[in-house]
From Swiss-Prot:
GO terms for molecular function: structural constituent of ribosome. Residues 33-57 have a biased composition (Basic residues). Keywords: Ribonucleoprotein, Ribosomal protein. InterPro entries: Ribosomal_bS21 (IPR001911), Ribosomal_bS21_CS (IPR018278), Ribosomal_bS21_sf (IPR038380). Belongs to the bacterial ribosomal protein bS21 family. This is Small ribosomal subunit protein bS21. Pfam families: Ribosomal_S21. The gene is rpsU. The lineage of its organism: Bacteria, Bacillati, Bacillota, Bacilli, Bacillales.
Length: 57
């Protein structure tokens, strides 16, 4: 989990912006979206090969 310390004389907006940036870097929201619904390994492989095929063209 991203953790920041609010600096002296720092506004709440800038602290919130720093927190959002740190959480985006750590990938918390991406991991949450990925784990929201279970996906079978065979489906993952199929999606990965489809994405590779799309990139190729």
């Amino acid at each position: 989990m991203a953790e920041i310390r609010v600096k002296k004389n720092e506004s709440l907006d800038s602290a919130l912006r720093r927190f959002k940036r740190e959480s985006a870097k750590s990938g918390v929201m991406a991991e949450l979206r990925k784990r929201r619904h279970f996906e079978k390994p065979s489906i993952k492989r199929k999606k990965k090969s489809e994405a590779a095929r799309k990139r190729k063209f």
